């Protein structure tokens, strides 16, 4: 049956990393010690001094091009799904037209031990017959262990029409012995409740199986998610399907209210389900015979790494912690924090619990040679056996996943130091009716810094870096960059870094960035980057002479929006934090307020308008809008932002400003600083330097610009190069003539129609580089000052106060605030 997938199956292998472990638990007879080290005073001294420690074991498994997924454990043996090159069928004497032309990709079953020994199990599913214009293959979607010693694998045989993109999927459950002998094959025909309707209507349809478990009593349970959209209708379903393990006959179906996180088998033989009620995780026991659930407990955070363990134990990750849940008693115990064990968030998904109570997860690193995998084996260890290390304290507001990985890498590489993190976002209360509580974490961090409680390392992405630098709380990173053998200023985009400097000193890492700017038709805004407030006023006057209802930006942009944004852009023009002075009574600020006054007070959301009347590109072409706000995050964004203008000449002119060009750089991710009080600055630099190196910046390449010039040149080359589509198994997708199909680079919407983007041209790259070279402002925020300006300007906007009186009162209030911050 043909159906269009709303979720492309090309991401099945990658998405599987984010799903929970669906393997069976050790046998019920094994009762390992799986508990947190006791608190002081709760146990004898020899039992108290134990902490969870991680051991990182390289896994030698050649040819893998996918991470280890869907882990399952029996005793101390581990099983995983992966994928890679299973054959090279290059004909003798034939020179391939491209690398990999004759390589054969396929799914792989990996057997491993906690010591890093591994082997590929000798089962290779039969490949679909080759058809011109059709890309086909086989995926392993799920793996579980049967109590009789065999393995169950969920196979998905896919077929994708190269021209139409239409797909066909045929799933089967295959029971295997470890020697590759197929014991049972059960074609699955009854999982999709919406499939026939989707075929009739031609709507978007997808089906996935996020869980598989054997109850050991002749039944298999599958967790099924189904999505259908067509004919103006949207439907989705989450359910458990219980099948007879001999015949594949559907025995029971249980509809669920929320999204499925995992389905696992406990050591006692019972099946357990982890799912969501709204955004709250809940755990329940599954009765496959009756087809019902018994809810046991709930959790507080998004789930990762759900796995069955001995007896009635279920283990799961939530937030940074890993927990054990007694499904019989409903009692939960925290075992450890991943970060405390030097394990990154991205490495806490495919989790297994061994018979002796050790916890195993996986990590992988992509390289030109393929995927390098390692096992992360965690176990309670006597504290006396753990080498003591000096601790560097890091304070952050929202720890980004890539930063978490850098912390993990640093801690693993160091024998003398380790980093411990306090994420102040944990103190935010988004359920409070008081908006101040939403930023309680940031307020707490600022209060502690003022009081002298300064950590060794600080994420200053939401902090006033200039003021902290002026107070002598931060360390200049430039001397460290200059003396670093792998860096030096010649290796970095110093123009961008200089924009982030304060009085010639760089207090923060700037790894990746993008440009915030504006775009207008050249006939309206001119042909040059940058303009003054006077030039803007003239352009707006000319536009309104043609249409008095024309606006500066889109109809949604209000006065408060415009004033806030321009304040962030021009903060340094009006405030000198080092002197504790400001000049909001200047002529330049008066012009800014006059400019902002031209914006509407609010947008009328009840207005009867069409989508075309709201489209900023169409409004600019019709002379109803002067320019639009846009971001340049990659070279292809020139196309994305100009596609709707029909080839009309346009200019990335920027916001009107009295100094420089009215575009600004925005930092991406955590911006790290070394405090002046840090006693181990060389060790702190050993961590911070990672954010300037390729290994970190390459992770975001293509999405935002890097400051490392080697990574930047690589990004520029790839933006102009042709890349090709891959099939779900990793092989190249081919057209009817057997040629590789060019990969999509994204798309832009023009008047509601999707337009595919192409490779960037040399002219587009030169334009981006011209804009970057002309930009010297940085996005700078201060919520307290913003409120002073917004409240002070409101009477002027409402014709209740003159412009001169308005700026006088704003200057008076702002001067007091700025002086207090010195």
Question: Could you say what each language-model-derived stretch is?
Answer:
Residues 642-726:
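Extracytoplasmic/periplasmic substrate-recognition and gating elements
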Residues 422-492, 618-621, 626-627, 643-645:
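Extracytoplasmic "Venus flytrap"/periplasmic binding protein-like
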Residues 478-491, 572-594, 654-663, 799:
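Short, solvent-exposed loop/beta-turn-alpha elements that line the ligand-binding surface or hinge
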Residues 666, 729-814:
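C-terminal capping/gating helix-and-loop segments adjacent to ligand/active sites or protein-protein/ligand interfaces
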Residues 210, 226, 446-447, 455-456, ...:
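A structural signal for short loop-to-beta-strand junctions that line the ligand-binding cleft
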């Amino acid at each position: 049956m043909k159906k269009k997938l709303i979720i492309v199956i090309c991401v099945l292998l990658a998405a599987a990393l984010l799903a929970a472990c669906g393997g069976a638990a050790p046998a019920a007879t094994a009762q390992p010690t799986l508990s947190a080290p006791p608190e002081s005073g709760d146990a004898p001294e020899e039992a108290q001094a134990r902490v969870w420690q991680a051991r990182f074991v390289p896994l030698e498994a050649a040819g893998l091009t996918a991470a280890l997924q869907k882990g399952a454990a029996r005793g101390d043996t581990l099983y995983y799904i992966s994928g890679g090159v299973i054959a090279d069928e290059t004909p003798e004497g034939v020179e391939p037209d491209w690398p990999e032309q004759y390589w054969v990709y396929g799914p792989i079953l990996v057997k491993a031990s906690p010591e890093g020994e591994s082997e590929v199990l000798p089962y290779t599913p039969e490949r679909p017959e080759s058809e011109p214009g059709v890309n086909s293959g086989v995926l392993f979607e799920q793996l579980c262990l049967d109590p009789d010693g065999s393995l169950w694998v969920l196979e998905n045989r896919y077929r994708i029409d190269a021209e139409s993109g239409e797909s066909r999927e045929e799933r089967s459950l295959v029971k295997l012995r470890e020697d590759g002998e197929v014991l049972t094959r059960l074609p699955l025909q009854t999982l999709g409740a919406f499939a026939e309707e989707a075929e009739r209507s031609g709507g978007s349809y997808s089906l996935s199986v996020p869980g598989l478990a054997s109850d050991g009593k002749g039944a298999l349970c599958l967790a099924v998610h189904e999505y259908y959209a067509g004919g103006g209708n949207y439907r989705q379903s989450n359910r458990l399907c219980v099948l007879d393990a001999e015949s594949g006959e559907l025995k029971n179906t249980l509809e669920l209210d929320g999204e499925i996180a995992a389905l696992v088998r406990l050591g006692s033989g019972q099946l357990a389900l982890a799912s969501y009620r709204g955004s709250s995780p809940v755990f329940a026991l599954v009765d496959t015979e009756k087809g019902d659930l018994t809810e046991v407990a709930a959790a507080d955070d998004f789930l990762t790494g759900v796995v069955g363990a001995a007896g009635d134990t279920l283990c799961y990750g939530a937030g940074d912690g890993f927990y054990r849940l007694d499904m019989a008693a409903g009692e939960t115990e925290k075992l450890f924090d991943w970060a405390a064990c030097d394990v990154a968030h991205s490495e806490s998904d495919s989790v297994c619990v061994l018979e002796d109570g050790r916890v195993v997860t996986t990590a992988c690193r992509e390289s030109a040679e393929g995927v390098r995998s390692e096992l992360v084996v965690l176990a309670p260890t006597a504290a006396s056996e753990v080498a003591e290390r000096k601790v560097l304290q890091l304070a952050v507001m929202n720890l980004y996943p890539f930063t978490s990985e850098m912390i993990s890498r640093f801690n693993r590489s160091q024998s003398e130091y380790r980093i411990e993190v306090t994420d102040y976002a944990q103190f935010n209360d988004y359920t409070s009716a008081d908006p101040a509580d939403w930023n309680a974490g940031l307020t707490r961090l600022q209060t502690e810094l003022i009081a002298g409680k300064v950590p060794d390392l600080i994420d200053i992405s939401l902090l006033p870096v200039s003021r902290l630098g002026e107070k002598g709380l931060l360390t200049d990173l430039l001397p460290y960059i200059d003396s670093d053998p792998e860096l030096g200023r010649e290796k970095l985009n110093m123009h961008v870094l200089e924009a982030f400097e304060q009085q010639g000193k760089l207090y923060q890492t700037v790894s990746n960035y993008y440009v915030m700017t504006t775009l207008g038709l050249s006939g309206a805004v001119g042909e040059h980057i940058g303009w003054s407030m006077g030039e803007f006023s003239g352009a707006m006057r000319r536009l309104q002479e043609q249409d008095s209802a024309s606006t500066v930006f889109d109809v949604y942009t209000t006065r408060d929006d415009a004033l806030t944004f321009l304040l962030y852009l021009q903060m340094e023009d009006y405030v000198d934090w080092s002197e504790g002075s400001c000049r909001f009574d200047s002529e330049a600020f008066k012009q800014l307020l006059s400019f902002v006054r031209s914006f509407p007070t609010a947008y009328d959301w009840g207005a009867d308008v069409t989508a075309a009347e709201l489209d900023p590109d169409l409004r600019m072409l019709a002379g109803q809008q002067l320019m639009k706000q846009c971001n340049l995050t990659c070279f292809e964004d020139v196309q994305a932002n100009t596609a709707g203008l029909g080839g009309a000449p346009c200019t990335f002119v920027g916001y009107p400003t009295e100094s420089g060009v009215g575009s600004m750089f925005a930092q991406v991710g955590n911006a790290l600083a070394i405090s002046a009080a840090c006693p181990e600055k060389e060790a702190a630099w050993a961590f911070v330097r990672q954010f300037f190196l390729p290994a970190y910046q390459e992770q975001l390449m293509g999405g935002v610009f890097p400051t490392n010039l080697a990574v930047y040149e690589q990004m520029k080359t790839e933006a102009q190069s042709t890349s090709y589509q891959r099939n779900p198994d990793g092989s190249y997708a081919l057209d009817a003539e057997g040629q590789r199909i060019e990969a999509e680079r994204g798309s832009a919407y023009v008047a509601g129609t999707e337009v595919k983007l192409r490779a960037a041209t040399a002219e587009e790259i030169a334009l981006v580089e011209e804009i970057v070279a002309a930009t010297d402002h940085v996005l700078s925020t201060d919520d307290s000052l913003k409120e002073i300006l917004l409240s002070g300007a409101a009477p002027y906007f409402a014709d209740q106060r003159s412009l001169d009186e308005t700026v006088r009162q704003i200057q008076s209030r702002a001067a007091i605030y700025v002086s207090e911050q010195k």
